[in-house]
């Protein structure tokens, strides 16, 4: 299946911005699951490409001029190949995704919640856990921020999609199931 991608990120500032730096991670690579037929990133200012520890390409862009609006655009054509659900890249150990982060720690009440739902560590029960998290933690815009951790959002019983993702990841890792945000 071929996908034509046109992704745009628009920044609008209430005050003039200057001397900003963006890390742009919108550079897909060809693999056994997809072929990148063409890809282009459009970003104002100067930029350079590098690779991270997982060999992913990313761009660092700098804007030295004053501005109030900034648009970053990624466009291209990707040919996707049929794959099974649940595929894990073989060059990265899934055990890496058991590592806790500040945003994805799991306390005892969260672990109890997860264990009550996940009787068997299978896909069906993990989907059920995700549904139970959505029931427990109501989606409420502007109630959390990018610095809100999974524990705080879980106990506040409200948050946004990133909080739901962090809570699910934290609980999976608490159950010794590798999990990551993709």
Name the predicted role of every residue range.
Residues 1-112, 176-177:
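Linear, non-domain "peripheral" regions
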Residues 38-40, 55-56, 70-72, 141-145, ...:
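Short, charged low-complexity intrinsically disordered segments located at boundaries
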Residues 82, 92-159, 167-169, 174-175:
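Secondary-structure boundary elements
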Residues 164, 173-182:
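Active-site-proximal binding-pocket segments
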